[in-house]
């Protein structure tokens, strides 16, 4: 399962909650990947696409080893999310009605 939405919307909370109930689940958090693996990337569209490709690669390795990845990331590109859906990835968008949070996020990451 791939959860996506704005920062603070509850993606990690949902992953952690579901992780308790699914055997052999594995949490992949976009913030942790960015700080430990993708620290060389920024927040421009191309870098965010590279980040998603890296996460997808890690998730594929987990699936091949018999784990069930629960992924939490911030991502907004409809084309990429549609591509992920077309290959069978279950995407769940987590939304929170907060105009202020959205404005802060967009200003911080220039999106």
Protein language model annotation of sequence segments:
Residues 12-60:
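Conserved substrate/cofactor phosphate-moiety recognition/catalytic segment
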Residues 3:
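Hydrophobic anchor at the beta1->P-loop junction of P-loop NTPases
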Residues 95-111:
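Small-molecule kinase domains that catalyze NTP-dependent phosphoryl transfer to phosphate-bearing small molecules
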Residues 18, 41-43, 83-87, 106-108:
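Short, glycine/charged-enriched secondary-structure capping and boundary segments
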Residues 44-91, 95-98:
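Glycine-rich phosphate-binding loop used to anchor ATP phosphates in small-molecule kinases
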Residues 6-7, 12:
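The conserved Walker
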């Amino acid at each position: 399962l791939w959860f996506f939405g704005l920062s603070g919307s509850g993606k990690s909370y949902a992953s952690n909650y579901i992780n308790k109930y699914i055997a052999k689940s594995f949490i992949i958090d976009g913030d942790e990947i960015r700080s430990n693996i993708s620290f060389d990337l920024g927040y421009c569209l191309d870098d965010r696409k590279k980040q998603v490709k890296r996460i997808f690669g890690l998730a594929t390795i987990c699936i091949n080893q018999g784990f069930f990845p629960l992924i939490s990331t911030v991502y907004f590109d409809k084309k990429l999310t549609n591509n992920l859906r077309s290959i069978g990835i279950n995407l769940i968008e987590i939304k929170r009605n907060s105009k202020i949070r959205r404005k802060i996020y967009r200003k911080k990451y220039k999106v």
